[in-house]
Amino acid sequence: MIELNKIYNEDCLEGMKRIPDGSVDCIVCDLPYEVLNKNNANVQWDRIIPFEPLWGQYERVTKDNAAIILFAQGMFTAKMMLSNPKLWRYNLIWDKVAKTGFLNSKRMPLRQHEDICVFYKQLPTYNPQMVKCEPDKRNHSKGDGKHSQKNSCYGTFVEVPTIISDEKYPTSIISVSKEHTIGHFFHPTQKPVALIQYLIRTYSNEGDTILDNCMGSGSTAIAAIREKRNFIGFELSKEYYDKACNRIKMELAQPTLF
């Protein structure tokens, strides 16, 4: 049986078989894209996981209202969307802020984003992360109940300024800088903890269980801990499994304010 808040150093397709049916509230995973140098022995882990058995496990272990959130880019985005068109709903854009691809800058635009594919069976938990903004002031029509030639629909009225809100709903673009700081970069395809925290806050509630079947260096586990969620993780590489476990130990050892 699978324990919560633990990473397993094994093939995720085998490990997920031990997760009870309908027990996962949300999946956040950065699957291998198979875009790194295929001749580099250090990135042999970057191989696409067969979609059919992967989706078989995803659909079995998740609750009906669980969001399945998968990172992708380029042709892998198309493959990912077509791997389960029945459950695919929409894509988010991760704006990395920093640009890459300068060697090809005279041939194509600089790259600054990756895709995030969102799948689900039924409408999932959705907690929109409101964005602070300047209060939106609009003129509000206040009628007196009398009809006039000024406006045949609303009658005589005066306009009064009304403050609508100092928050706005989030868009499909999420801007979070990549983690480049020495001591915070552990994996070549590492995603920012802040980005995963944003996704976890949006698509789950405190106490929920988050699955990441390609845990890498443990960013999803760190994000889950900070957002008071449980996690289940799998990582095939012993090197990155060890790094993830060490990061989790360091995170749990940090003093909290509460």
Residue ranges, per PLM feature:
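Short, conserved SAM-binding/catalytic segment
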Residues: M1-I2, C245-F258
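Core catalytic lobe of class I
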Residues: M1-G233, S237-D242
